[in-house]
Swiss-Prot record:
Pfam families to which the protein is assigned, alphabetical: Motile_Sperm (PF00635)
Membrane topology qualifier: Multi-pass membrane protein
Protein's gene: MOSPD1
Domain of life of the organism encoding this protein: Eukaryota
Domain called MSP: residue spans: 16-143
Keyword line: Endoplasmic reticulum, Golgi apparatus, Membrane, Transmembrane, Transmembrane helix
Name the record gives this protein: Motile sperm domain-containing protein 1
Organism: Pongo abelii
Length: 213
């Protein structure tokens, strides 16, 4: 005897549901957007029943709110916004598509679709552009702040070591030269001509370094 091939039992709520798009945006100033289409796909080897639920059903008309999808087929669900008022701008509504096997009532899977009413497509594009520019400026400021301390360190003026060397060189040049007999400075502080030339050379380098900063 041939045994009948049994389909594996599906767990409630775990079946992936394929819907496109997953977000609906209606624009008040564009009537062509007041009617939009959801497409439900059935890639499986068995037929599916579907049902469309909504958090605010009084604001929408759903054509084909319930029905069936054949195996490896799709069905279009038309959704019309019938309450286009400014008080609904920016309010997020949700549609839920539940699917089940034709022979059973339990929901095998579900998918939520977000719906939003906006005043104008142009305003939406303008807001997105302003947001993009703001993010770009924020990033620019972030990088400038990151490198600012380094710039300050470079342009903060001569270091203490440079100033100290400059003072030493000036003091060396002011000391008497070897051979000056009439000096009150002790003899061991008398410098030779070569030593003073070295001090003058170093002082010149220090002066150039200070001027560059």
């Amino acid at each position: 005897m041939h045994q009948q091939k049994r389909q594996p039992e599906l767990v409630e709520g775990n079946l992936p549901v394929f819907v496109f798009p997953t977000e609906l945006i209606f624009y008040a100033d564009d009537q062509s957007t007041h009617k939009q289409v959801l497409t439900l796909y059935n890639p499986y080897e068995f037929a599916l029943k579907f049902k469309v639920l909504c958090t605010t059903p009084n604001k929408y008309v759903v054509v084909n709110a319930a029905g069936a999808v054949k195996p490896q087929c799709c069905v279009d669900i038309v959704i019309r916004h019938r309450d286009v008022r400014s008080c609904h701008y920016g309010v997020i509504d949700k549609f839920r598509l539940q699917v089940s096997e034709q022979s059973q009532r339990k929901a095998l899977g579900r998918k939520e679709v977000v719906a939003t009413l906006l005043p104008s497509a142009k305003e939406q594009q303008k807001e997105e552009e302003e947001k993009r520019i703001k993010e770009h400026l924020t990033e620019s400021l972030f990088f400038e702040q990151s490198f600012q301390p380094e710039n300050r360190a470079v342009s903060s003026g001569p270091s203490l070591l440079t100033v100290f060397l400059g003072v030493v060189c000036i003091a060396a040049l002011m000391l008497p030269t070897l051979g000056d007999v009439e000096s009150l400075v002790p003899l061991y502080l008398h410098l030779s001509v070569n030593q003073k030339l070295v001090a003058a050379y170093i002082l010149g380098l220090i002066t150039m370094a200070i001027l560059r900063t």
